[in-house]
């Protein structure tokens, strides 16, 4: 299991610190990282709190060495071939195309993969847990996808309907496996 905690709002880092402690006991197999990290200072803070990876909505070359020194993956948001190439040169093994739906969709990823076939691309933004949405992304060559509110609807979370969320996750994983077959 991989889970990205969104760094948004006052005291988000404090919540993350408590989440890391809880996950260590309740879900020791979970890989927990911090997202929406836009500067090196914030990356350092989350690394000290136990983040296993850092994700950003943009590529900030100052974050890469902070993560590289600790051998922690940094996945920056990129919206062009140049940004993806620069992120890879800075040591980022997985780049995030964000916002994927606005950047050009699956055709953008497919076109990037032609000259940069070694790229590991994660897409977020406009990714939905449906077969119609996931299949084109997987066929375009993405390594993985990121989903938030479409996978964890607010009303379902508020109702504590964890069975529905589990079912939606399993369904999405099934679509991904089918697209990769």
Language-model regions: role of each:
Residues 5-24, 40-44, 54-88, 99-117, ...:
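Active-site-adjacent beta->alpha loops and helix N-cap segments on the catalytic face
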Residues 125-131, 149-151:
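Glycine-rich beta-alpha junction loops
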């Amino acid at each position: 299991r991989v889970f990205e905690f969104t760094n948004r709002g006052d005291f988000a880092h404090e919540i993350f610190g408590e989440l890391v402690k809880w996950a260590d006991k309740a879900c020791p197999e979970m890989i927990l990282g911090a997202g929406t990290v836009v500067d090196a200072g914030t990356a350092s803070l989350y690394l000290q709190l136990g983040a296993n990876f850092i994700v950003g909505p943009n590529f900030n070359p100052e974050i890469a060495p902070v993560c590289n020194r600790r051998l922690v993956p940094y996945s920056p948001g990129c919206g062009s071939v140049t940004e993806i190439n620069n992120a890879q040169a800075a040591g980022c093994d997985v780049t995030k195309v964000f916002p994927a739906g606005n950047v050009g969709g699956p055709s953008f990823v497919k076109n990037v993969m032609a000259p940069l076939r070694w790229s590991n691309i994660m897409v977020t933004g406009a990714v939905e847990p449906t077969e119609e949405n996931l299949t084109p992304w997987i066929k375009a060559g993405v390594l993985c996808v990121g989903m938030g509110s479409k996978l964890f609807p607010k009303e379902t979370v508020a109702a504590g309907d964890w069975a529905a969320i589990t079912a939606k996750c399993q369904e999405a994983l099934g679509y991904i496996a089918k697209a990769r077959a």
